[in-house]
Amino acid sequence: VETPESFKNVYKTIQDAELGQQFGFRGDGKVPLSWYAPILEMQSAASAAIVMFWCLTQGATTVLQEFGTQKQQDMFLPKMFTGEWGGTMGLTEPGAGSEVGAVASKALPTDTPGLWKLKGQKCFITSGDHDLAENIIHLMLAKCPGAKEGTAGISLFIVPKFWVNEDGSMGAWNDVTTVGIEHKMGIHGSSTATLAMGENDNCFGWMVGEKDPVDGRGIGMKQMFSYMNEERLNTGLFTLGCIDSAYYAALDYTKVRVQSKKSTDPKGPSVRIIEHEDVRRMLLFQKSGMEALRALIYQAYLFRDLEVDAATPEEREYYGDMFAIANPLCKAYSSDMARILTGEAIQCHGGYGFMEEYAPASLYRDCVIHGIWEGTNFIQSQDYIGRKFTMKDGVPFKKWVAEIDDFVASKKTDEFAAEFAMMADAMVAFKDIVDMNAAWTAGDKQMRQLFATRTMHAGARVYCGKLLLSQAILAAEKLAELGDDHFDANFYKGKIASAKFYIMNHVTDIFGYEKAMKVGDKSAIDIPEEAFM
């Protein structure tokens, strides 16, 4: 599989500068993930496709560092960290997408402890085959003989494209065949492969870690979730990069495109479209949405760092809980909003936005996959209203809600009085939404499913409102200190405008969600299947 020629120099440059999967290193001297976040955002803004070649490798190194044996780490990690070898995540199969427990790939024991023979097929494997690295280390889910049904029976295996000898050198081809490359809507240049293992009955792999399945129970899903949790957070950044590029393309275009007269000067000259009211609304809709998502995602990266490195066990547990709650919002809310925000960037371009010569068209296509990767966004909303609402008897989620309440109650200022009042009303509505979900959990589970996505959006909007309003308070303080003539003045003015707009235009959607949930329309459930016509 050949990548675009331009990718090869970029990949080498990233590896030489150690700005790729090297940030996945978890040992002494590691770089905080929150420090890496803006780098990955900029990389994603430059190309949503090429970042996958090192980000998937980073995820694989995370699993091996946490669960691999010392021997496995010594064999694979050095060359994965240098970029000489790539890595992938092999979950999806033709018959096992969101229902991961339906995997049909098999692992058969050999006479060598820890070594298994693999047979099966994986599809939609990002970076599944390419020419940027000399070897690719696949982490494949499969089931051993006697495995339990569903996810409980899944184990995780290290399956290299080319065999790796015990001294870390590369051996012969390991019977992992690329049988197809997908022709995708977006992220062109990122190889999405269908892989067959063991077509010649000669594919082998190591089970990750030392424990074989006990009573048919594997720990592969637990191990893979270490990968997926990080990749879900990264996916939020990938989609944010697309939003960034689309917004700045729209901003640049509206500053030079001259069309129509101002509404306040109908006899005057035609003006740049950035001077028209609705274009300014679209731009601030994008800017505020982009900055809200950035605040949400960067906060989650900080939680992830502190979950590991905070001073006390109690603090580490707290930050781990906060990361767990934020993560589905980072992945799902961000990628849901990406389609809307990049769509607004297209609209700012008018007819030219529909042309492939202009950036927003490809950025829109690129970001669509982010709502599907790492568990579809409905699965993320299920996680949010299910596990995250109730984990540890609901104590962490209640604390999360209380922190937003406390902020709204304690940070009132004259300058932002209207925004704090709107946030207070929004929190009343959000808690009402949470209560309705709790009632449906005990009773009407179909209603809970119908409104899961909107509940997730409601939580994301109030949390982002809190984050942007806290930024606006700081921006107002700095602006008062530095004055309008300071070179950072417009930056701070932009922060204030983003917070005001977001709270008064994005957060207010919560009231519509609350109303719809109270009405409880079930027409989507009641409609006969035959009536979908």
Residue spans for each PLM region:
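Amphipathic, small/basic residue-rich leader segments at the start of a protein or domain
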Residues: 1-55, 71, 75, 305, ...
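A glycine-rich, basic-preceded beta-loop-alpha segment at the flavin cofactor/substrate interface
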Residues: 163-179, 184, 194-231, 251-274, ...
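Flexible, glycine/threonine-enriched loop-and-boundary segments that flank and lead into catalytic domains
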Residues: 2-13, 19-24, 88-112, 117, ...
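N-terminal glycine-rich flavin-associated loop
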Residues: 52-70, 97
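A structural-propensity feature for long, helix-poor, extended segments
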Residues: 60, 69-72, 76, 81, ...
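C-terminal amphipathic alpha-helical interaction region
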Residues: 38, 391, 406-533
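A short core secondary-structure module
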Residues: 115-173
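Alpha-helix capping/hinge segments and adjacent helical runs
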Residues: 187, 299, 317, 321-402, ...
